Amino acid sequence: SHWFNAVEAEVYAISLFFTAMVFYLIVRWADEADNPASDRLLLIIAYIIGLAIGAHLLNILAIPAIALVIYFRKKEFSWSTFFALMAITVVGFFVIYPGIVKWLPATLKISAIFPLVIFLAVLLGIYYAVKAHQRVASLALISVFLIILGYSTYGVIFIRSTLNPPIDENNPDTIERFLFYLNREQYGDVGLFPRRWNNDPKYSSEWDFFWRYQVDHMYNRYFLWQFVGQDGDYQGARVDISKFYALPLLLGLFGLAHHVSKDRRRALVVFTLFLMTGYAVIVYLNQNDPQPRERDYAYTGSFYAFALWIGIGAQGLLAYASRWFKGKNNLPRVALVLALLFVAIPMNMFAKNYRMHSRAGNFVAWDYSR
């Protein structure tokens, strides 16, 4: 799925790049949190989140994981502080979405300068917070400012549409059409319930549809494609264990167990990222059957999170190997284990995936463009 996203003219590759960036930066912040200058990393994260939602909303699903890193780095665990964290995270989430994403542009209906008034009010709040040496308040307000600044890239859509280019989907060249475009109203509104959107008799109940189609077919299958194997490049492709022999999956599960045994808190952070960018998306989207195309591209954030456990699993195996091969000549043996891991997993995945993803000789896009 990562490979597919990388060669498709879509938003999902850059969206995952921003997700990976904010996750890397929050880990860097955790290492430097005792240094007051580390606040700059939090501000960079806020700006990247703003840029990211200018591409796709998936990036905001990393916010709970970011909040957990900050919490575990600054607080000792207690249920009271943990629930306080959850409340703050929910408030912060709603400030961004729907607050900045939907409500701020909607103020254009009141007046074209109303968003500018809000923007200036945030700047004024920053000035007084900094002047009063309110570190947390100033950090929060500057973060809001940077998120708005990053999100302002959406203005390019409005400017471009007013020039009436040949491709101008939804024609967002007026305030009404622009808000229609921002709110994705062309896709309709699907609620979380009921889950059953198909009366096919093969589904016995709403729960059966949710599990068999939405979870198993529309997520578990994609997840196993990445780490077990895919039997072909066609709609509805099944899982094929003969591709990767499930070695990446097993190494990732070992990495998860190793991570939990060594650092439960950071394991919970990665699990939160995995859950929010995977199964939580499934619950939110409430997809109907059938879908016009495969949707694996939307869940690459969770595949990225699991890949972290594959890396941790490889490190854990090397650590165990160094203990098993104690003595003066242990380095060549550990190097052999590393080489075997490299050949058995990434090299094998490259070899088995290359033909399916190679565009050599594929002129379909060119032919259609003519």
Regions picked out by a protein language model, each given a short descriptive name:
Residues 4-12, 55:
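Short acidic/glycine- and proline-prone juxtamembrane loop motifs at membrane-interface regions
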Residues 17-18, 43, 58-71, 113-122, ...:
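Transmembrane-embedded, aromatic-rich helix segments that form part
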Residues 22-41, 68-79, 126-127:
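Membrane-interface transmembrane helices that cradle and orient dolichyl/undecaprenyl
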Residues 41-55, 89-91:
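Membrane-interface alpha helices of multi-pass inner-membrane proteins
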Residues 122-130, 244-264, 316:
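Hydrophobic, aromatic-rich transmembrane alpha-helices
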Residues 161-258, 274:
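Lumenal/periplasmic acceptor-binding loop at the mouth of the active site in multi-pass
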Residues 260-264, 312-350:
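Signature aromatic-anchored transmembrane alpha helix within multi-pass, membrane-resident enzymes
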Residues 279, 291-317:
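Hydrophobic/aromatic-rich transmembrane helices and adjacent perimembrane loops
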